[in-house]
Curated annotation (Swiss-Prot):
Keyword Cell inner membrane assigned: no
Cofactor(s) needed for function: Mg(2+)
Compartments (UniProt record): Cytoplasm
Catalysed reactions, semicolon-separated: RNA(n+1) + phosphate = RNA(n) + a ribonucleoside 5'-diphosphate
Lineage: Bacteria, Pseudomonadati, Pseudomonadota, Betaproteobacteria, Burkholderiales
UniProt protein name: Polyribonucleotide nucleotidyltransferase
PROSITE patterns named in the record: KH_TYPE_1, S1
Length: 706
């Protein structure tokens, strides 16, 4: 009899067969599920503490997605030969899992929860992120932890006008969309996508299609829970202190209402802090025993109620706008004198200084991914220091949020970048957020597009981004255009859309409540399009098209094509030839397998010299042509003459002079420059030369023949 109480569920999901197991591996975790999706195997575990920490007012959920190189039959390339800090993909996948599960834990549940996912085996054609989402949903569902799941998730492609469920790596090359959707049976909770300028209707259709397909996984998880689920925790939210809530409300309501009439963010924040301090002081004066953390939570609830009720009543928003108006926009290009491209994009109290740097192919990021190595010639890095929100704090390595925002902005711009053939540069865009009051990632999209155009990158179109919000109470709702930071915190949805005049290039949606309908999403998309067109108009006014020339401080790239068989000649033994070329000409030279050579130099003259020398190296020796070159070696029967770099010919002793030559050294010496004519090449490719045909015969007026 086995010591394991293993339960297995298998279901067909599109073209994939999925098997979920629990009860054999990681039995001491609160919940653990091993999921196999056609050779991609992930282990999802969840552990929750049985008690919350005293005085804690937030939900401490941590999600760690970890890839093991053995999953793809690899050994880590680092010095220590073991996995190190999380890769960007691991960080992004951790966020992808966190976003749809976080809203499903009950309000007031502050017990620490740790979700860990290990990728144990990888089929390159089956994405581990989707497998991980399903496995985490199953592990949480069987654990008994308070959780309003399960969730389903699916990747959606769009190929030849049709939606495709969970397309693999190969199929995605033909897809004009890469969309991931996650949600419960009833509602969509999270969307992450990039697209090739597609319409709102196609994008919304993909969300609906993906949500429907995710329900197949939800049904299978229900079956697993029925057979293997642990008892549901007997957890109840702490009872609310109604008398204290009423007391705080009486003391704070008017003060906070007055604070939210202030349009300036910094002044409003100060007024709210002062209101908090006054309420705490009044409670102490009244002799009320209270927990300051709990009172702060009550005050936040009052703030939320004020802001939400004002918006639903049709009153002006926090900064005085209506629901559809975009904040004032200011744009300045070429802000920094010696960078390759720069733009300062300001929208209200959100500002991004975005800088583009152009490099050679050698500057491309080499990524050692589990599914295979590749190079990325476009990078976008997002930084938001504490001063952007008027706060103090630590500055250092990028946090998960910064990595996620950078990735979203990158996705938005990728669809309109020129191909490598059109523009062979490596591009790095850095967005420095210098002010933030909502939607800084979308400011990075707008500023990034303008910065690239300022650098001379021939973009296919302008790209703008906008963040939408939602306030919903029962059947009443309001969609907000260009949300502020406070509206993001106090609202029910963060919906970011980026695109061109032709269509959407990136879409990200995070919903904090259930009950968002297709109709609400349609309204949000239509309102976002209206705002996007407005911003695109402002951007086109500021910069109608990309500069026709790259910056004088950027490297100039010159391309040429050689016979691929000649690549070894240009590189030389141990890289000696190309190393000498780069050092002597002061250029960077990159050679592709197809024989395309890219020469990079800020000085066109140096690039031309490198090109001339490469042409020399790769040139073929022509029969009948006269060459001038040094003697590289004296032999008993002749001499070797260098005709072209790396190409020597034999000058036989009989071809040195018309008279009989007894000793080669009587006529020639090493290093001597001589003129020779190529007479023939033998079957082994050896080159035969003659000097005497270029010399006058004794007693005659000219050479034999030239």
């Amino acid at each position: 009899m086995s010591i394991f109480n293993k339960v297995t569920k298998t279901f067909q999901w599109g073209q994939n067969t999925v098997t979920m197991e629990t009860g054999e591996i990681a039995r001491q975790a609160s919940g653990a599920v091993l999921l196999d999706m056609d050779g991609t195997v992930v282990l999802a575990t969840v552990v929750a503490k049985t008690e919350g920490k005293a005085g804690q007012d937030f939900f401490p959920l941590t999600v760690d997605y970890l890839e093991k190189t053995y999953a793809a039959g690899k050994i880590p390339g680092s010095f220590f030969k073991r996995e190190g800090r999380p890769s960007e993909f691991e960080t992004l996948t951790s966020r992808l899992i966190d976003r749809p599960i976080r809203p499903l834990f009950p309000e007031g549940f502050f017990n620490e929860v740790h979700v860990v996912v290990h990728t144990l085996s990888l089929n390159p054609e089956v994405d581990a992120d989707i497998a991980a989402l399903i496995a985490v949903s199953a592990a949480l569902s069987v654990s008994g932890i308070p959780f309003s799941g399960p969730i389903g998730a699916a990747r959606v492609g769009y190929i030849n006008g049709e939606y495709v469920l969970n397309p693999g790596q190969t199929a995605r090359k033909d897809s004009v969309m890469d969309l991931v959707v996650a949600g419960t049976e009833a509602a969509v909770l999270m969307v992450e996508s990039e697209a090739q300028q597609l319409s709102e209707e196609i994008m919304l259709g993909a969300v609906v299609f993906g949500h429907e397909q995710g329900n197949i996984a939800i049904n299978a998880i229900h079956e697993l829970v029925r057979d293997a689920g642990k008892p549901v925790w007997d957890w109840k939210a702490p009872a609310k202190d109604e008398p204290l809530i009423a007391k705080v409300g009486a003391l704070a309501a008017h003060k906070l209402e007055a604070a939210y009439q202030i349009r300036n963010k910094q002044a409003r924040t100060r007024a709210c802090r002062e209101a908090y301090a006054v309420v705490m002081a009044d409670l102490k004066l009244d002799g009320v025993a209270f927990d300051s953390v709990a009172v702060e939570g009550m005050l936040f609830d009052i703030e939320a109620k004020i802001v939400r009720s004002q918006i639903l009543a049709g009153e002006p928003r926090i900064d005085g706008r209506d629901t559809r108006t975009v904040r004032p926009i200011e744009i300045r290009n070429s802000v920094l004198p010696r960078t390759h491209g720069s733009a300062l994009f300001t929208r209200g109290e959100t500002q991004a200084l975005v800088v583009t740097t152009l490099g050679t192919e050698r500057d491309a990021q080499r990524i050692d991914a589990l599914s295979g190595d590749y190079e990325d010639r476009f990078m976008l890095h997002y930084n938001m220091p504490p001063f952007a929100t008027g706060e103090t704090g630590r500055v250092g390595t990028p946090k998960r949020r910064e990595i996620g925002h950078g990735r979203l902005a990158k996705r938005a711009l990728m669809a309109v970048l020129p191909s490598k053939e059109e523009f062979p540069y490596t591009m790095r865009v850095v967005s420095e957020i210098t002010e933030s009051n909502g939607s800084s990632s979308m400011a990075s999209v707008c500023g990034g597009c303008l910065s690239l155009m300022d650098a001379g990158v021939p973009m296919k179109a302008h790209v703008a981004g906008i963040a939408m919000g939602l306030i919903k109470e029962e059947n009443r709702f309001a969609v907000l255009t260009d949300i502020l930071g406070d509206e993001d915190h106090l609202g029910d949805m963060d919906f970011k859309v980026a695109g061109t005049t032709n269509g959407i290039t990136a879409l990200q949606m995070d919903i904090k409540i259930q009950g968002i309908t297709k109709e609400i999403m349609q309204v949000a998309l239509a309102q976002a399009k209206e705002a996007r067109m407005h911003i695109l108009g402002k951007m086109q006014e500021a910069m109608a098209e990309a500069k026709t020339e790259v910056s004088t401080f950027a490297p100039r790239l010159f391309t040429m094509k050689i016979n691929p068989d000649k690549i070894r000649d240009v590189i030389g033994k141990g890289g000696s030839v190309i190393r000498a070329l780069t050092e002597e000409t002061g250029t960077q030279i990159n050679i592709d397998e197809d024989g395309t050579i890219t020469i990079a130099s800020a000085d066109p003259a140096k690039a031309e010299e490198a090109k001339r020398r490469i042409q020399q190296i790769t040139a073929e020796v022509e029969i009948g042509k006269i060459y001038e070159g040094p003697i590289t070696k004296i032999l008993d029967f002749g001499a070797l003459v260098n005709l072209l770099p790396g190409k020597d010919g034999l000058l036989h002793i009989s071809q040195i002079a018309h008279e009989r030559v007894e000793k080669v050294t009587d006529y020639l010496s090493e290093g001597q420059i001589v003129k020779v004519k190529v007479m023939e090449t033998d079957e082994k490719g050896r080159i035969k030369l003659s000097m005497k045909v270029l010399l006058d015969r004794p007693g005659q007026g000219g050479p034999e023949h030239v």
